[in-house]
Design a protein with these regions (language model features):
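Fold-level signal for large, globular catalytic cores of enzyme and receptor domains
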Residues: 1-3
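Solvent-exposed soluble domains appended to multi-pass membrane proteins
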Residues: 9-340
């Protein structure tokens, strides 16, 4: 029975309020593909990614960011990222495709619409999107940067072709770097850490090269590794792909350190069972970054811990994180308190 979707999507709150307050600060919401709590709970994976987390922590400290981390339950495992996206964006628990398609027929208010109603430009960065996407109208984005819009001129890496670092560089150049603009709500679904986790693009330190006509020269050796991996090789590639996207978060913190945004980076689901294990919990890490400590106070009050290493406590489900984001964004104006 999914009638509850229509019952809650037309709540009095949505009709009467319809806006949020974040002091016109940008909000970057990054879903890191296949970033599950197995990276912390499996000692082998944690040993691999720990240097990347330490580097991210150093970048955050250098550029004046405070950090907090928690664990949330995802509605899916090993795939079907769109279910987690829809759950967080709407505050409804969307755990099946039936629920998802039913949701699209409702007038549920998404995070994009909340911020858009407050004067924000709502954008989606979806480098893995290569087809028509009617769902975009439901979410209410002003602009969807799909694979075609990103105009990637380089070699294809893996199944999804476009490296996340290129996507971020292109998007920031077109949207985030503009001085005189409306505040930005940005949803970014990464793809480089998608199964099969290779070949992995090199990290480019010289960002202007990413926006040149040849963003990845001399990668023949990397591309020769574009085969099927199994067992330990697959697990190693998974760790390396996660490190890549952790580096991507570092890049975003550096790029935007002069703009004081709120950055939320989280997993969409655990990796497949061959990586996480068949009995792994359906949980994902959530990292919050802000240069204003008071912004993190509400997350800390909800059980988040300081830094990038979560404790083992699951704080709730991703539909509940939706409300926490609204409460945090609107803390100075009004506290949202509704049930889904």
């Amino acid at each position: 029975n999914i009638d509850w979707i229509k019952e809650t999507s037309t709540s009095k709150l949505a009709d009467d309020v319809g806006y949020v307050e974040l002091d016109e600060r940008d909000l970057y919401l990054m879903f890191l593909e296949s970033y599950g709590t197995t990276v912390f709970q499996n000692p082998t994976y944690f040993a691999h990614i720990r240097p990347g987390l330490e580097q991210l922590s150093e970048v955050a400290e250098k550029y004046g960011w405070y950090t907090a981390t928690g664990i949330y339950q995802a509605p899916t495992f090993g795939g079907a990222s769109w279910l987690s996206h829809a759950t967080l964006m709407t505050g409804h628990w969307i755990s099946t495709n039936t629920h998802y398609h039913k949701l699209l027929t409702t007038n549920s208010k998404t995070l994009a619409l909340w911020f858009q109603n407050s004067g924000y430009r709502a954008t989606a960065l979806l480098p893995g999107l290569k087809r028509e996407w009617p769902e975009g109208k439901f979410y209410g984005y002003d602009k969807v940067w799909n694979a075609k819009a990103l105009s990637y001129p380089g070699p294809p890496f893996g199944w999804w072709e476009i490296p996340d670092q290129y996507s971020l560089a292109f998007f920031y150049d077109k949207e985030g770097a503009i001085d005189l603009r409306d505040p930005l709500f940005s949803f970014f679904a990464t793809i480089t850490s998608h199964m099969p986790f290779h070949p992995l693009p090199p990290i480019e330190q010289d960002w202007p090269i990413l926006l040149s006509s040849e963003p990845y020269p001399n990668v023949e050796k990397v591309m020769k590794g574009n085969g099927v991996l199994y067992g330990q090789d697959l697990q190693t590639s998974y760790s390396q792909a996660i490190i890549y996207d952790i580096q991507l978060v570092s890049d975003l913190l550096r790029l935007t350190s002069h703009q004081n945004p709120l950055v939320i980076a989280l997993g969409d689901h655990q990796p497949p069972a061959m990586i996480a294990g068949a009995n792994a919990p359906w949980t994902v890490p959530v990292h919050v970054f802000s240069q204003d400590q008071t912004t993190l106070d509400r997350f800390n009050s909800a059980g988040f811990v300081r830094g990038l290493i979560p404790n083992n406590k699951t704080l709730g489900r991703l539909d509940e994180l939706h409300q926490l984001i609204l409460n945090t964004a609107n803390a100075s104006k009004q506290t949202f308190n509704y049930q889904n």
